[in-house]
Regions:
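Gram-negative bacterial Sec-dependent N-terminal signal peptides
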Residues: 1-29
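Ser/Thr/Pro/Gly-biased, low-complexity, turn-/loop-rich segments
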Residues: 2, 25-265
Length: 265
């Protein structure tokens, strides 16, 4: 034991299960969380941090930094310091992400029956099949911010996986567009990144989704008449959705964007 945790080799095939609580079980669940141990898989190193009781986020981030230094020295610790791209997956809630992915797949398969959207549906299905997804907690993983504000430093009962990141000087173009990786530049905005690409017939010609490295997303205008001149962070994804105001298509598009923000990168 060291600093309240132990390292064990991560075994392959970790299976996460999600718990569904009835209203009558909420109180007992909250009580059990007080005693529930914390396990955090460090995906960069194939190791697991074990804590005998719920641990605060700050401690997990500190221990992850320590492991970075032990693995490859200070250079590795500095490389894995792009906190905007850190990912904390809640393994107890994996079933929720699996259900969302299944729902999106079913929606796209149904949409493919419409000849006008067949090609678009196949493009998006192929995109989704390329990745694995986890339930990503929407939480600030900047250790300096976590130290300064108590409400950014929650206890973490249960099972988690942490992926640390280095800065990637690239931007991904995905969706109903020529899907490719382009170099990041501080001089470019969303419209600039899209300018040299070809959209599919159903691709949105005036709006795009920007998915930041932290998983947050926003829909912005990029055409000449509604250009918001939005810049992006390195490692961001620009997603082109449907050129339609149909409510069902908009909901499907939003679900796809949510999944893309939860890729286990």
């Amino acid at each position: 034991m060291k600093n309240g945790f132990s390292f064990v080799t991560l075994l392959s095939g970790i299976v996460a299960s999600a718990l569904t609580l009835s209203p009558s079980a909420v109180a007992s669940s909250q009580e059990s969380n007080i005693q529930q141990a914390t396990q955090v898989v460090l995906l960069n190193h194939g190791l697991q941090l074990n804590y005998p009781q719920p641990v605060r986020l700050e401690q997990v981030l500190l221990d992850a930094q320590q492991q970075n230094r032990q693995q490859n020295g200070s250079s590795n610790a500095q490389a894995l310091s792009f906190h905007e791209g850190f990912q904390l997956f809640n393994l107890n809630k994996q079933a929720e992400t699996d259900a969302l992915l299944l729902h999106v797949r079913q929606q796209l398969i149904e949409l493919a029956k419409d000849e006008d959207y067949r090609q678009a549906s196949q493009l998006l299905l192929t995109l989704l099949e390329k990745h694995q997804y986890g339930y990503r907690e929407n939480i600030n993983l900047d250790i300096d911010a976590v130290r300064l504000k108590a409400d950014l430093n929650p206890a973490l009962p249960g099972h988690y996986a942490l992926k640390q990141a280095s800065r990637e000087n690239k931007v991904l173009l995905l969706g109903l567009i020529d899907q490719k990786t382009v170099p990041f530049s501080t001089d470019l905005d969303v419209a600039d990144y899209i300018a040299d690409s070809t959209l599919s017939n159903n691709g949105n010609k005036s709006e795009a989704w920007v998915i930041a490295p932290n998983g947050n997303s926003s829909k912005v205008g990029y055409s000449y008449w509604n250009n918001q001149h939005m810049s992006v962070l390195p490692g961001s994804t620009i997603f082109i959705g449907f050129n339609s105001s149909n409510d069902e298509l908009q909901a499907l598009e939003s679900d796809i964007v949510k999944l893309l923000g939860m890729i286990k990168g």
